[in-house]
Design a protein with these regions (language model features):
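Conserved beta-strand/loop scaffold segments within soluble protein domains that form the structured core
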Residues: 91-240
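N-terminal leader/transition segments
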Residues: 1-149, 156-158
Length: 240
């Protein structure tokens, strides 16, 4: 069962962890509407989830995601909390599920993420906190034929200010990143994200971002793509 499926008491998923491959899912073989910006020929049925590595070298001031699994920072950032999926409180679980419910595409990519997600992290910026230092998120596949499917949730609470960098890196022969990022930007909060996608020419990246922001909040995002077999970025922003 995936990390997200475990949050849903009505789930009937029976998938075993770390045993999924792309061939388990009904990926499209023609250029249907939901796939029109992607070269379907780049899909590799050999992609599969890696085993969890308990010795990931964590960052001091940010998140390290290696082969889909998340290592929390070793240091503290004042005003910021990082919570792994397995440690979410009942209140945090409710928050995560409410954010997921806002963006329900019901397509094959959501099926992969929901049923075969590797890991999950919730990052919360406390109310009124101005975070001077940039929070780093480093994403890398170190294994060939690796299917990396993490979830990231960012909550910028009222009157807070925070900036993130998301750095995709890696030089594997073949691998697949399917990253789901959900952010909630509350009243008068500011959230800024800078992304660099610099994987090898044989790696595939699909980044799905769902942003919910209050009317008086500020959200900025910059994405630079340097390389990759195919890269697809989906960004949905809603004003609440």
């Amino acid at each position: 069962m995936s990390i997200v499926a475990e949050l849903k008491p009505t789930s009937t998923f029976s998938f075993k962890p770390n045993k999924h491959s792309v061939s388990d899912f009904a990926l499209p073989t023609t250029r249907v509407e939901s796939w029109k910006y992607t070269r379907v020929g780049a899909i590799d049925s050999n992609w599969e989830q890696a085993e969890r590595n308990e010795s990931i070298v964590a960052l001091e001031k940010g998140i390290r995601i290696e082969n889909g699994f998340i290592a929390l920072p070793t240091g503290q950032i004042s005003g910021v909390s990082f919570t792994a999926g397995k440690n979410l409180s009942a209140e945090q679980q409710g928050l995560v599920l409410s954010m997921l419910a806002k963006e329900n595409r019901n397509d094959v990519f959501d099926a992969i993420s929901e049923k075969a997600s590797n890991d999950l992290v919730l990052i919360e910026i406390q109310s009124g906190k101005i975070i001077e230092e940039t929070i780093s998120i480093e994403i890398e596949n170190t294994l060939s034929d690796c299917m990396s499917t993490p979830y990231m949730f960012i909550v910028s609470k009222e009157n807070s200010i925070a900036k993130f960098t998301i750095d995709f890196k890696g030089k594997t022969e073949r691998s697949f990143h399917l990253v789901q990022l959900h952010a909630l930007v509350e009243q008068s909060a500011q959230l800024e994200i800078h992304q660099l996608q610099n994987t090898s020419k044989n790696e595939c990246v699909l980044l799905r971002e769902s942003i919910s922001q209050s009317e008086k909040s500020v959200f900025k995002i910059t994405t630079v793509t340097a390389s990759g077999a195919w890269v697809r970025n989906e960004l949905n922003i809603r004003i609440e």
